[in-house]
Amino acid sequence: MTTVHPGTTSVSLPTQSTYQSRVADYWNAEENPVNLELGKLDDLYHHHYGIGDADRSVLDEPDPGLRRELITRELHRLEQAQAELLASRLGPLSPEDRVFDAGCGRGGGSVVAHQRYGCHTDGVTISAKQADFANDQARQRGIDAKVRYHHRNMLDTGLATGGYAASWNNESTMYVELDLLFAEHARLLRRGGRYVVITGCYNDTYGRASREVSLINAHYICDIHPRSEYFRAMARNRLVPVHVEDLTPATLPYWELRSEADHLVTGIEDAFVTAYKNGSFQYLLIAADRV
């Protein structure tokens, strides 16, 4: 018998292909310390990377246990800075507004948006385990009346057309076809609504996807898109960019520090560092208005 958290709503087909089922299986089974140990610090669980200058003095701590704790806190500070940057690009928003978190993971980004604006948030994840976890966290925080998570497909959410003032993807676009994704965002957003994405993409000027990008794809069972495809797909789906920011230099310190965190590494760190340094991979923020 399957028990469903009362805060989770389901649709009949959260996964609509064999590939999507494999992605759901991956995230239902995922227990990486780099996600869980950082989130335990303040119950803000993120599934994205960090930005900003890292305090590398944490590596000088001689006590192994304290060193691990300091590194964990510093990495979490950097990933929280990334979440705050994304949230800052969603506004201005009011407490009456509703926002949509596509590929919400364990829910940290929706909480950050709610804390900043007081708004209603709907997060969607293909992982039933993540939706249950995120709803439980919202209930423990006492914000479950306004912050809710759903076990649904972000390409076919079933949520209200034109009901959202803002929406975003934070490192989840590489699991889907961009035209299908942006069509759903355009449907959900009211006219003038804001869409924000932070994502890794391969650099068209490099040529094709590099070896390192291919390794990242294999590691996460994803398909990283070229930078150019984001802008083409947005144009086809009534999303007009108003701000583009290259976060590649800002995320490199996070990856360099993480690569030295023996208790948190997943084995993909060197591929990220190399790809960012050789120019084949970029980390972008794009904000767009729905017209």
Task: Give the location of each predicted region.
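N-terminal auxiliary segments of SAM/dcSAM-dependent transferases
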Residues: 2-48
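Class I SAM-dependent methyltransferase SAM/SAH-binding core
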Residues: 98-100, 109-156
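Conserved alpha-helix/loop element of class I SAM-dependent methyltransferases that forms part
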Residues: 55-62, 76-97
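A short acidic, Gly/Pro-enriched loop at the edge of an enzyme's catalytic core
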Residues: 155-167
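Short alpha-helix
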Residues: 222-238
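Short, glycine-/aromatic-enriched active-site segment of Class I SAM-dependent methyltransferases
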Residues: 200-221
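A short glycine-rich, Lys/Arg-flanked "PGG" loop and its adjoining helix->strand segment in the class I
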Residues: 179-194
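Conserved catalytic loop of SAM-dependent methyltransferase domains
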Residues: 243-265
